């Protein structure tokens, strides 16, 4: 038996992203997390980005698609869609929300998911789009092929989370 230590692939650079119909997603955060985790760009290890400040709970599995990059091309697409010229890419991999009816208890995992749509978002004048996907073979969500087919409340919950999770209660939204 070979018990030697094997190197862990960097989740952003060292893992195949899959195909447009079935992506691999590296999950950083699950709905029960009270801390926002993020992959350290240099080491590839999951690290604490910040404690969740308020009672917002991420409404799905959340992470990124390996080997993607929200930079110049994403900024161009966002500028075109919003009729703007000043949006930049955020320099991170493309974010993904993976819907599942199962309770996944921790992040730092890879899942296979079917993209069904997305949300175009800005964060401090940077493109911060979110791909919305469903977990492969999920008993409830795998029947959905388009974000427009989802129950409206699920889409509203996603939009609400991403438009309010950085807000400070009692202060005007920036």
Where are these regions (language model features)?
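Hydrophobic N-terminal alpha-helices or hydrophobic patches in metabolic proteins across all domains
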Residues: 1-174
């Amino acid at each position: 038996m070979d018990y030697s230590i094997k190197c862990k692939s960097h989740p952003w650079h060292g893992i195949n992203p899959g195909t447009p119909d079935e992506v691999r997603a590296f999950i950083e955060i699950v709905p029960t997390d009270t801390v926002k985790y993020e992959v350290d760009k240099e080491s590839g290890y999951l690290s604490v980005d910040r404690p969740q400040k308020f009672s917002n709970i991420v409404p799905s599995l959340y992470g990124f698609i390996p080997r993607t990059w929200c930079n110049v091309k994403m900024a161009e697409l966002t500028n075109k869609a919003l009729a703007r010229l000043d949006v930049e890419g955020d320099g991170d991999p493309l974010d993904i929300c993976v819907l599942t009816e199962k309770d996944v208890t921790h992040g730092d995992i890879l899942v296979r998911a079917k993209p069904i749509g997305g949300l175009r978002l800005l964060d401090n004048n940077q493109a911060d789009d979110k791909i919305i996907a469903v977990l492969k073979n999920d008993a409830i969500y795998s029947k959905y092929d388009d974000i427009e087919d989802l129950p409206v409340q699920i889409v509203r919950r996603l939009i609400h989370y991403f438009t309010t999770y950085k807000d400070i209660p009692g202060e005007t939204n920036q």
